[in-house]
Amino acid sequence: MRVLVITGLSGSGKSTAVRVLEDEGFFCVDNLPVLLFPTIIDLVCRSGENVAGVALVMDIRGRDFIKGFEKVFQQISEAGHTVEVIFFDATDEVLVRRFSETRRRHPALESGSVPEGIRYEREQLAGLRRLATHVIDTSELNVHQLKELVHSRIKGESGTRPLTIHLQSFGYRFGIPLESDIVMDVRFLPNPHFVPELKAGTGLDENVRTYVLEKPETRQFLERFMDLLEFLVPSYQREGKSYLTVSVGCTGGRHRSVAIVEELRAFFAGLGLVVKVSHRDKEKG
């Protein structure tokens, strides 16, 4: 039986993920005490129902969950089930804004401010986050994008889709994307920001791309990085991974990282892989 544990910070999108899982045929249970994990899984198995798996939503409301999850996960795995932990996250700023929009109090604390609740929840869930199979940062996602991302990862993990590569550019000044599997820093490449006629452009503009890509150090870097990726992709596939996020960062996320990601798009497409591209900070940098 495939068992998904949906967890993460309050306000990060877990409820949206559950709706996607229900549509995909998962038996979903919200806020179940950790000690009842094995029981509910056993009941679903015995019922004979044709379900895609069991999805259990666990968060800060289940205090005993935080204390006993490792032992229970091991027990479930030893029973022959596959346990995947999907951790939903977002920046503190985004979470505060979401709570403000919904006018809800933070569930982690009966009293105190929302920022205090977020900090406390992060501390309590830190160990679980380290064990996560996937970390999904929803800070920059709308509801439709989040649904698509969850759908892609869930369907891919069941083996119905080929490996999907998500290439994204970002700016280090805005933070590393939390959902990254591979992060490449390209701040060592020549920076168009300091060329007056290129500064206002982006890595999607032909003159900016030419400036970045025609430098000898860029060509050498791409050759070596592509060799590494070509080696890694089959290894990830053998491990059952179906969604690989490769993040490329420069200072502002506007010029170099964008140009490199666009070059990698063609490379991965040439390998016959499904490729999705996003430029997170292109308009910020």
From Swiss-Prot:
SUPFAM superfamilies: P-loop containing nucleoside triphosphate hydrolases. GO terms for molecular function: ATP binding; GTP binding; molecular adaptor activity. It comes from the Bacteria. InterPro entries: P-loop_NTPase (IPR027417), RapZ-like (IPR005337), RapZ-like_N (IPR053930), RapZ_C (IPR053931). ATP binds at residues 8-15. Pfam families: PapZ_C, RapZ-like_N. GTP binds at residues 59-62. Keywords: ATP-binding, GTP-binding, Nucleotide-binding. Belongs to the RapZ-like family. Displays ATPase and GTPase activities. This is Nucleotide-binding protein GSU1884.
